[in-house]
Amino acid sequence: MAETSTIGSGVALVGCGSATPSQRISNDQLGQRVDTSDAWIRSRTGISARRVIGPDETLTGLSHQAAANALTMAGWEPESVDLIILATSTPDDLFGSAPQLQAILGARQAVAFDLTAACSGFLFALITAAQFLRTGAMRRALVIGADQLSRWVDWDDRRSCVLFGDGAGAVALEATSAAQNGLLGFQLKSDGSRGDCLNLPQVQNHLSLVAGNSHQQGGFKPIQMNGQEVYKFAVREVPAILQTLLKATNTAPESLDWLLLHQANQRILDAVANRFAIPQAKVLSNLAEYGNTSAATIPLMLDEAVQDGRIKPGQLIASSGFGAGLSWGAALIRWHGPI
């Protein structure tokens, strides 16, 4: 449903940060492992390279770097943070990595938890955090989108291994007056009936416990994806949810300063932009360098564009995330920057 509540305060995005692994793998390098080429990958995805987490790196470590950078931009002390939400489907600890992140940051006053919504995770977490702030229950929140899908990819499957990379991005949210509100509207959707076209399923190994009793010991298979179905889902549902969002907020596409989509495939980015006649100069993309970093793509791109001066305070951004679940969402954001 559209966000229309005015209870409590507004929410301002006052800081951002990002981090990526040191290992960079090019398309040509992947072509040494699987039957593919730079031209084949770029023509179908727009991806030229991706960052892959190394043996001495962790998702929590990347998340810490991104969150610390967001704190620095916002000018906050870690102890002033009330809430930390880590959007990830690939935590270091399946029970949750957000509490470890809280400890490393020194954010002793913050409640911290993971939120899992795959590639939609960052937007879902952003909107969740905003509701805590708007009720007045909390004042400051860190939202981190981070994933290490390289650990769950079949590196011998050229259809999927070329797509994914690792990374982390973070934003700092602060409760503000309604006049400074930076989250102007949102839409969230889920459809589990189509979830089998993109998943990371369990693999079960039979284990005999005691006489007459058995158990299926759990593990996970590599990422399973029907690329054609995911593409059709994205080019159909993303324009539709953005159209609903723009109508609900009485926003004309031409009034947008930027279109910031989940970085999954350049063809999807182009199709959505064309649907709204948004010029390519307004479409933010770093897909070529990083690939699909799942929950990290939107905050990673946001931070890059803020750091290089493309995104300026007061500018209007339409953002949409989509992915496994199936899940998808959209948000209309006005970038604020440090207060």
UniProtKB/Swiss-Prot annotation:
Q: State the EC number(s).
A: 2.3.1.180
Its catalytic activity? malonyl-[ACP] + acetyl-CoA + H(+) = 3-oxobutanoyl-[ACP] + CO2 + CoA
Alphabetically list the UniProt keywords: Acyltransferase, Cytoplasm, Fatty acid biosynthesis, Fatty acid metabolism, Lipid biosynthesis, Lipid metabolism, Multifunctional enzyme, Transferase
Q: What EC class is this?
A: transferase
Q: Chief location of this protein?
A: cytoplasm
Q: Name one GO cellular component term.
A: cytoplasm
Catalytic residues per the record? C119, H262, N292
Which Gene3D superfamilies does the record match to this protein?
3.40.47.10
InterPro entries linked to this entry: ACP_syn_III_C, ACP_syn_III_N, FabH, Thiolase-like
Q: Which residue windows are transmembrane per the record?
A: none
Q: Which Pfam families match?
A: ACP_syn_III, ACP_syn_III_C
* MF terms in GO: 3-oxoacyl-[acyl-carrier-protein] synthase activity; beta-ketoacyl-acyl-carrier-protein synthase III activity
Q: Quick one: where's region ACP-binding?
A: 263-267
Q: Which domain of life is it from?
A: Bacteria
Question: Could you mention a single GO BP entry for this protein?
Answer: fatty acid biosynthetic process
| CDD domains registered for this protein in UniProt | KAS_III (cd00830)
Tell whether Iron is among the UniProt keywords. no
Location relative to the cell: Cytoplasm
The pathway it acts in is: Lipid metabolism; fatty acid biosynthesis
Give the UniProt family note: Belongs to the thiolase-like superfamily. FabH family.
For domains, the record's comment is: The last Arg residue of the ACP-binding site is essential for the weak association between ACP/AcpP and FabH.
Q: What HAMAP family does the annotation carry?
A: FabH (MF_01815)
Q: What does this protein do?
A: Catalyzes the condensation reaction of fatty acid synthesis by the addition to an acyl acceptor of two carbons from malonyl-ACP. Catalyzes the first condensation reaction which initiates fatty acid synthesis and may therefore play a role in governing the total rate of fatty acid production. Possesses both acetoacetyl-ACP synthase and acetyl transacylase activities. Its substrate specificity determines the biosynthesis of branched-chain and/or straight-chain of fatty acids.
UniProt subunit comment: Homodimer.
Name by which UniProt lists this protein:
Beta-ketoacyl-[acyl-carrier-protein] synthase III
